[in-house]
Amino acid sequence: MGTAAGLLLAALLLAGTSWAQREVNIQQGPLYRAEGSQISIWCNVRGYQGPSEQNFLWSIYLPSAPEKEIQMVGTSDPSFSYAIYSQRVRSGDIYVERVSGDHALLHIRQLQEQDAGEYECHTPNTDPTYHGSYSAKMNLHVIPDTLTVSSPAQTLQKVEGGSLQVTCEVSQNSSQHTHLSVSWLRISGGEEHEIISLTQNLSVRAGPTYAQKHSVGDVRMDKLGDSTFRLTLYNLHPSDQGEIHCVGTEWIQDPDGTWFPLTQKRSEGTSVTVQPTDKEFNVRLETERRTYGAGDMASLRCIIDAQNPAERLFAVSWAFNSSLIASQSPGGVPSLTGEYAKREDRGEVRVGKDSDIVFSLKIFHLRPEDSGKYNCRVTERERGPSGELIDRESKRPKNIPISVLPLRTSLTVTVTANSSSVLEGVRLSLTCSVASLAGPQSRISASWHLQDKQGRQREVVRQDRDGVTWAGEQYRERLGTGELRLIRSGSDTFSLELEGSQRTDTGSYECRVAEWVPATDGEWQLLGERSAQANVDIMALETGFAVTAITRTPGVSYFDSFDLQCILKPHYPPWVGVSVTWRFQPAGGGDTHDLVTFSRAGGVQWGERAGSFRGRSVVEKGDSTHTVKLSVSRASDSEAGKYQCVAELWRWEYRGTWTQLAERASNLLEIRVQRPVPRLQVSKVTRTLSVVEGSQVTLSCSIRSQTGPDSRFAVLWFMRQPSGADGKLIVRSNTGMEYGTYAEEASLKGRLQLEVTAPGHYTLTLQGAHADDSGSYYCQVEEWAMDPNQAWYRLAEEASGMTEIRVRVPDANLQLDQIPRNVSALEGQSFTVTCHVLNRTLPDSRLSLEWLSWWAGHMERRALVRLTVDGVTILGSVEEENVAPGLPSRMQVSQPSLGLYALTLRGTEVQDTGTYSCLVQEWLQDPRGQWYKRTEERSGATYVSVRQPDPALQLDSSLLNVSLMEGGHFDLDCVVSSRSRPDSQLAISWSLQGASRGAEQETLLNVDRSGVWAPMAPRWEGRLQQLQLSPTLFRLHVPRVGQGDSGNYTCLVQEWLQGPRGNWYLLAQDESLIGWIRVQSKESNLQSTICANDALFYLVFFYPFPIFGILIITILLVRFRHRPTSKPGEGKNGVPLLWIKEPHLNYSPTCLEPPVLSIHPGTID
C-alpha cells in the first residue's frame, strides 16, 4: 500500500511539472469605497490553454446570503446578469472592460449600498482537463459619504499689489481611518490652475504657476481649528484674477498600500478681480526693406512703447527662424550664440541698444543663407524682495521675413569634339570654350565628367582656379603616361585630349566651369557654375569586322581541283594586325581542325592534322592583303567536308604589346567530292515457295549490270521473318565465306551451300528446312572500286527481290470436352473431376496435362498438379496463403481410359470449394528430333461445392416459476432436445438476469466442450455445481440462495464439430430461458409463502380445522367409552392410545409440493 501511494504521489508531482496550471487573480481586498462613487476591480488569468481571448464572469455574494451566488455581468453571455443587476448592466452603470485577452476590469459607475459583498471573478474552462483555479474572490465595503466642503460665495475687487484671503470648511465623519486633502484652484478663461494644496500626507504643495510666488512667501495656506482652511495671496497681479474654489478629498489606504480617493467635493467659487496699474507696454519690429542682395547690409529695430521706460527694466532677445541668435540684458549688454558670435568677431553682425526704447540688430554682409524670418522678444523684469530680477511680462511682435538674393554669374560654356564618332585607338579631342566673365578679379575652375551608356557618371580630370590639375581615380594612370591631357589655352579654353581611345571612353562628356570672386573674409566665394555636354561614340575596331568564304566549285569529282577564297572586311590601318586560319571538318564526321594559318606578321604555319593537304594544296595571299586563297588538287574523299576561314583582329598597345580584340569565323563552305555514278543492277524478281519441314530450298541472285570492268562484288544473304522489320545477315561471300549472327542463332552453318554458277550468278541452298526457317530471303550485292588514294571503296549496293519461304507444320486439331459440370460433397468426403480428350492433331503426339483451380475468395488461378509428356506427375504450387495444409497428400491423378483423365480429392474441406478444369498441351516432334508444343486447350469448368453438415441444435423451452426461502437451494435443468451430429461436443453457459430494474445479465458459469470450467465471479465461487446426467441433459445445482439470486435463469449451448484437419469449429448455438426464481427473506417467510400460494393458503387455514375437530371428537369418545375396563394409559387389547403430540408440516425447498401433515405416536399423561 505504501509503494502504491508513493507511485501515485510521484505521478502527481510529474504531472504538476509538465502541465500548465490555470490561475485566476483578482485585485486584493478588502476595499472600502464611498456610496455614489465609482470603482474598478481588475481580474486576470494565466497558465491557461486554448484561445488567447478568455471570458470573465463576475458574481457577488451578499452579506445577507453569503452562500448564494448572484450573477452580475460577463463577457460571453449578455443574458448572464440576474434581474437585480440586468437594468444597471443595460444602462452601462455596470460593465466589463477587456484590457487584453486575459485581463479585464469590472466598472461600477455609481456604487450603491447594496453593492457591498464578496465579488467573484470566474473564467470558464478552455483547457483539455480541469487543472488549477478558475475563480478568485475579494470583499468590497460600501460606506456612507460623510465629506462636506463649504465656502461662502462672494465677489472680491482687488488692486494690483494688494492681498487676498479666502476660507473654506472641510470635514468628514467616516467610521474608517481616512485622510483629508484640501486644494485651492483658480479658474480663468476656462483653464484650471492649482494654487496650493495640503495633501493626504499633510504636506503643502504649490501649483506650477504659483511655485515662484510661494517660494517668496506671496502664497500661503493655514489651518484654523479642526476643519477651517485659509488661503492668503500677497502682491496680487492681474493674472491672479478669476474664480477661486476650495476642493476637499477624502482618502483611504487600500491593502496594497496605495491611497485611493474615496470622494471629492468642491465649494462654491469666489470671484476675484485684480485691477492692474499702468504698466502695459507694446513692441514693434521695423526694417527699411525686406529684399536684399548678397553682400548688402540689413538693419532691424525693436521699438518698445511704454510709460516711463527709463525707470523700467526691459530685456531683449533676437531670433532667426525661431532660433535664438542674440540676447540683450536690461543694461544693453549683448550675448550672441553659435555662428553669429563668430560673425560678430569678424564685424559682420552687431547687436546694440540705441535708446531706452530702441534695440537694433545689424548684419553688414548678408549671405543667401541669411534669408528667413526675424523677430525680437521684449521681457519686462522687476526686482523681488531679495533684489533678484523676476520676469513680469513678455511680448513679441510679428515676424519680418527677409530675402537675400545670391550673386549670379553670366558665364556661357560650349563644348566641341573633333568627331562624334571615333575609331577605337584614334585620339579623342574635346574643347570647352568659356565667355562673359564677371570681371578681372574673378577666376574660373573647370572639370571634365563622363556619363557612360549605363548612366554612371565619373570625373575624368579637373583644374582648379589656381591652375592645379588632377585626374579622377580611373584616369590617374593614363594621366601619368601622357595618354590623358588637359590643356588650357588662354583664360577661356580648356581642351581634353585622350590618346589611344578605348571603348570605355564612349559617352556624354560634360565640361563644368565655376566662377569665383573674392569674399570679404579673404576667401573665395562661388559666384556660379555653368556646364555643356557633347556626345562621343568610340567605335570598336571589331565593329563591322567580318569574314566571308566563297568558292566557284562546291562540287567536284574524283581527281578534280577546287579553290577557296577568304575575304576580310573592312580595311584597317597598318598598326592593326590580322591573322587568318583555314579550318576543315571531314565529311565523314569528326572534330574540326586547323589546316593552315597566316599570322599577323605574315608567316605560314600548317596544322598538325593537315595530312595529305600539304602535298596537294597551295596557299596564296592577295595583293590587297585582305584575300587568302586555298587551292586543292586531285580531290578525293579525304578532301570532302566543310571549310571555314577564321580571322583574329589584334591591336598594338602603347605598352609595346599586342591585344586581341576580336575573332570572326566565316560561313561554312561544304565541298562535295563525288564518286563515279554507279550503274549496278540486281534482279528484282519476287517468288513464294511453300515446303514441308525437312525439304531443300535453293535461292538465286543475278547481277544484270555493273559500273566498270574492274569492279569487285560482295554478296550478302539476308533473312527477314514476318515479325521482323530488318533482315538478319545469314552469310557473306567475297574472297571467302563469312557467316552472320543469324546463322549462329538458327543453326544454319551445317545446312548452307554457296555457289557461283556463272559470272554475276550466285545461289544459296538450304538443306532440311525447319518451321523456324519460314520468312523472306534476299541478297544484297556490294560493288567496290579504287579511289585516287589507291584504296578500295564501296561504290554501290543493291538488294534483290524477295523470295518468301513457307515451311508448313501439321494443322492443330486438339479437342477437349467443354461441358460444364457441378459436383457437391460433404466435408470429409471425396470428389472426382474428369478431363476428356476428344481428338488430337497426330496419333503419335504427346500430351501434357495440368489441373487448375479457382477457389472461392481467391481471384488468381492455382496450379494443383501437372502430368508431363513423359507421364511424370508434378505437384503444383499450392503453398499460397489460406490454402489448407496437406493438400498434395489428398490429391490423386489417374487415367481410367485412353483420353480420359481424373483428379480425385480426399478428405474434402470447405476451402476446397471452387472451379476446377484441366489445361492440355499437345507436343509434336520436329525434323531435328526435338519435341515442341503445337497447341494447348482448356476443358470446361467443373464447379465443386463442399459444405458442412446442417445445424440441428435445439433446446427444450419449458419454463419454471419457483419461489423459495433464503438459504435454500434449487436445481435447474438444461435439456438438449436435438443436435446436429452424435459426435459433436457441447459447451454450456449459465447466466442470470437479476430481478432489480436495470440489472445487466450476469454469467454464472461457463463450461467448454471439454468440460473445463471458466473462472466465476467471487460471489459464485464455491457455490455452483453442474452435473451432466446424460449426453443431452445438464443440471445446475445452486445451494445457499440469497435474495440477490432472484431473476431469470438462461442456458446457452454451443455445438462444436471436428473438421477434417482435426480442428474444432462452432457449428451452431441455441439459448433457452429456463425459468424465474424468487428468493424470499426469513422474516416474512411463513405469512408471505402461504399468502403467495393459494394451495398452501387453503391447506393451512381451511382444511386442517375440520380434520382436527373430527380427530379430537373421535379420541374423546373412545377414551370415555373404555375408561372403566381399561388400564390407565392403555387402549383396547392393551394397545396404547394414539395422542397427537405435534403436527409437522414438511415443505419442499422448491415449494413445488404442498405441505404434508403427519401425526406421530405419543403418550397420554
Swiss-Prot record:
Membrane topology: Single-pass type I membrane protein
Location in or out of the cell: Membrane
Membrane side Cytoplasmic: residue ranges: 1117-1165
Motif EWI motif, residue range(s) on this chain: 250-252
Disulfide topology: 43-121, 168-246, 302-376, 432-511, 566-645, 701-779, 835-918, 974-1051
Gene Ontology cellular-component terms listed: membrane
Record-linked PROSITE patterns: IG_LIKE
Domain of life: Eukaryota
Occurrences of domain Ig-like C2-type (ranges): 22-139, 144-262, 276-386, 406-527, 545-661, 678-800, 810-934, 951-1067
Transmembrane region(s): 1096-1116
Chaperone as UniProt keyword: no
Protein name per the record: Immunoglobulin superfamily member 3
Organism: Xenopus laevis
Gene behind this protein: igsf3
